[in-house]
Amino acid sequence: MQRHRFYAPPAQITNASITLGNDESHHLARVLRLLPGAVVFAFDGEGNEYECEVAQINKTKTELNVIAQLSDEVESPLQLTLGQALIKSDKFDWVVQKATELGVTRIVPLITEHSEFRKADGREQRLQRWRRIALEATKQCGRRKLPEISDVQNFQQFCEQQTAGQRLIFSERGGSGIASLATAATISIAIGPEGGWSKAEIDLANAQGYIALSLGNRILRTETAALAALALVQYQLGDLP
C-alpha cells in the first residue's frame, strides 16, 4: 500500500493537529484526490513524522488529526557534508536528488578553478530549485530530515569552514583507498568538477587537513564520483549493511 507523505514545518504542527500549506494541500486534494478520513503521513524536516487522518480540506490548507508519532529510526547516524563543484545544471540536480536519498546532511555548491559557473545565472533561483528537489527526494525515500542546501561558496571558504571530524577530498590523481578511512561521526567530502582539481586546490586542501582518497583506477564523471564517495564512506563507517 502506498504511503502518502507530506511536509509540514514545525510551526504548522501542534500535539493533536497539523496544518498543510497551499502547495501540499493542492497535492493532497487535487493531484492525489484524497478525501477526509484518508490516512496520510506528515514529517517536519527535523526528524519527526506523524501518522494522521485527513480532517478538513479547503482551498488553501488542509487540517490533519495526529494519530501517532512514528518512532523508528530512518536517518543516517553520520553527519555528512558534500561539497560538490558546480557542474551542468541537470547533473547537479541529479546529485542533489541522489545524495538526499543516500542520507547526506548538507550539500554545498562549490566554485572551483575548473567548475562550470556563470555569474549571470540566477543564484537564488538555483538554490530554490535544489531545495525543491531535496524536498521531493526526502518525501520519496522516507527520510524525515531535510538536507541543508547551502549557498554557493568558493573552495577556500569551504575548506576553512569544515573543521570537525574527517575531511576528505576525492582526487583522480592518487590518494589512499577507502579502507584507510578512520572512524568518525562527522565527515566532509569534497568532489571536484569535470576538469578535476587544480594543483593549488589540492595543496590548499592538504594544508587544511583534508585526506586525499581515491575511487579507483577508472576515471568517473563528477556526478558518479559524488554518489560513489558517499556510498563508500557510509559502507566503511557502518551506515550501510
Name the predicted role of every residue range.
Residues M1-D72:
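N-terminal positively charged helical leader segments and presequences
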Residues L64, L146-S150, A212:
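Generic structural signal for residues in well-ordered beta-strands
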Residues I18-L20, P77-T81, A185-S188, A207-L215:
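Glycine/charged-rich beta-loop-alpha catalytic/anionic-binding loops adjacent to active sites
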Residues E73-R167:
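RNA substrate-binding interface of SAM-dependent RNA methyltransferases
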Residues Q162-I202, Y210-L213:
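Active-site/ligand-binding-proximal alpha/beta "capping" segment
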Residues K199-P241:
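Structured adenosyl-cofactor binding patch, chiefly the S-adenosyl-L-methionine
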Residues A11, Q69, I111-S115, N217-R218:
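Short, ordered loop/turn segments at secondary-structure junctions
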